[in-house]
Amino acid sequence: MPPIKRQPGGWVLPGYKYLGPFNPLENGEPVNKADRAAQAHDKSYSELIKSGKNPYLYFNKADEKFIDDLKDDWSLGGIIGSSFFKLKRAVAPALGNKERAQKRHFYFANSNKGAKKTKNNEPKPGTSKMSENEIQDQQPSDSMDGQRGGGGGATGSVGGGKGSGVGISTGGWVGGSYFTDSYVITKNTRQFLVKIQNNHQYKTELISPSTSQGKSQRCVSTPWSYFNFNQYSSHFSPQDWQRLTNEYKRFRPKGMHVKIYNLQIKQILSNGADTTYNNDLTAGVHIFCDGEHAYPNATHPWDEDVMPELPYQTWYLFQYGYIPVIHELAEMEDSNAVEKAICLQIPFFMLENSDHEVLRTGESTEFTFNFDCEWINNERAYIPPGLMFNPLVPTRRAQYIRRNNNPQTAESTSRIAPYAKPTSWMTGPGLLSAQRVGPATSDTGAWMVAVKPENASIDTGMSGIGSGFDPPQGSLAPTNLEYKIQWYQTPQGTNNNGNIISNQPLSMLRDQALFRGNQTTYNLCSDVWMFPNQIWDRYPITRENPIWCKKPRSDKHTTIDPFDGSLAMDHPPGTIFIKMAKIPVPSNNNADSYLNIYCTGQVSCEIVWEVERYATKNWRPERRHTTFGLGIGGADNLNPTYHVDKNGTYIQPTTWDMCFPVKTNINKVL
């Protein structure tokens, strides 16, 4: 999406007038050859936009001409501009010409040969490089660009009948990864299935506590489902992740392209014990992207609803729901005035309040996102900052020597030893002095974050209104399992095997400790607050970790450092919502009746990752992730991790090291 506040001169490179986005078409005289080429490129984009094309999402003739104009330009601006559009040529789909547009059809009929066909000028899927021969005239065709298969004009029975729906694919299956010195591109496709949720209704549901000491929760369940791409294992195969963490010192996502295509809407017909699934060529599915984050967040880290790791697994989309209020503060007990005031402020979000597409069988849609986030650093510190010195050189620093309650020992000052020089750098913050409140099965954390309005009636204690602040160790060494990140590899409702417990990363800027002296000994400081000169590294992620988390919208905040190592973003990718269209059917008593339908199709997700290869002066070999650290399992205990057994069961990792964490291999010089 374009920026809310566009700068008058655009976001151009320093010293340039046209080399960059969002600048006006007339911004003065170009400063050099690269700027002149950028001005011509902007004018070509303007013509494409006026003709109904979107040149920003697709590689086009103007981009190719810009690259050709700068092929002999070695200025800094020319190199940056040419490199950007070469990357776009490598990863973006091509904007088709008239001849190619005629090849794309949607068939809106069944076996009737005279049924009406409608055209769709969408580009071909994938990130194939556009050849010179394919970059031809890109003026708009006589038909409307991006036209969808429309209703009406179809003959024959709807919902299958004797014939079946016939159509041309709106995209192929994409997969695999590409590794370069500067970028890594991951491409994945999954078959998904979405069904009718909640009988097309919104409902307020009370989620009962799992224990007497737990919390109840109020939830608004909706008729919508959604796509969640927020996990590294959804995009990187184990081998790709091994290569990424072995060869690159840091990486971060830069752009994501999602395509939902080859939609097939089916009607479920039950006749006694028999069930028939017929094509429904007139039914629709609602799809839109919440790019402005106007609705409550759905992609919470560590949820099970992410895109499946295995390409052949069907992705059954989860139902969307959200929490409108802290239930304990809105129970209206004893006509409490505070709770009544809170209850009267409860919001109600209906997703139908947004514009969105309604697609039919055979149609497709696409979404593009840009990331603005920090790097994931993959280097480990082999020493702490306090040892960044030469131990062979004497120091001018001196220290005071206490007589230690011995009157015969005089107080004195002595020169500090060359190998024990003091440091200016302190450990990072963290909290380790608390424990979970029992019983053992309670839904609590060692620390609880709660909102407690004055005079509100609270029966369940802090566990009923708070959220577990977990794990709260910050950068400190965890003292027990209550301060370690743990997760299950198996889905909810199955046996709880595959429990992963994080280990120490062996990096000297993690798992730190601060000790306080008291004349005779040193005691551990369990709670360390924020001070100047604190130095620490981000929590080491694994392939099983989430990629991002959304920063809450607030007026103030301190240093943002999620405890699981995820990338905190102000604007992460917007949630893509989807639901089945409601098709009413007549009934004798005007009951709320509708067709029973579901939708399946393909969804592809392509992410461009910015990377930096490692370079080192270290003479010795370094540790790398290999297969020798994996396990053996399966039905007959014969199959290695990341393989399948005779029953088709996928052998998942059982330890933290098997998940190939970062910050365990490449040494960095502080």
Swiss-Prot record:
Composition-biased stretches (Gly residues): 147-162
Stretches for region Phospholipase A2-like: 11-66
The keyword Mitochondrion appears for this protein: no
GO cellular component assignments: host cell cytoplasm; host cell nucleus; T=1 icosahedral viral capsid
InterPro entries noted in UniProt: Capsid/spike_ssDNA_virus, Parvovirus_coat, Phospholipase_A2-like, VP1/VP2
Catalytic reactions of this protein: a 1,2-diacyl-sn-glycero-3-phosphocholine + H2O = a 1-acyl-sn-glycero-3-phosphocholine + a fatty acid + H(+)
Keyword line: Capsid protein, Host cytoplasm, Host nucleus, Hydrolase, Lipid degradation, Lipid metabolism, T=1 icosahedral capsid protein, Virion
EC number: 3.1.1.4
Pfam families attached to this UniProt entry: Parvo_coat (PF00740), Phospholip_A2_4 (PF08398)
Region (Disordered) residue spans: 106-162
Functional description taken from the UniProt entry: Capsid proteins self-assembles to form an icosahedral capsid with a T=1 symmetry, about 26 nm in diameter, and consisting of 60 copies of three size variants of the capsid proteins, VP1, and VP3, which differ by the presence of an N-terminal extension in the minor protein VP1. The capsid has a channel at the 5-fold axis and there are densities extending the 5-fold axis into the interior of the capsid. The capsid encapsulates the genomic ssDNA.
Protein family per UniProt: Belongs to the parvoviridae capsid protein family.
Protein name: Minor capsid protein VP1
Source organism of the structure: Human bocavirus 4
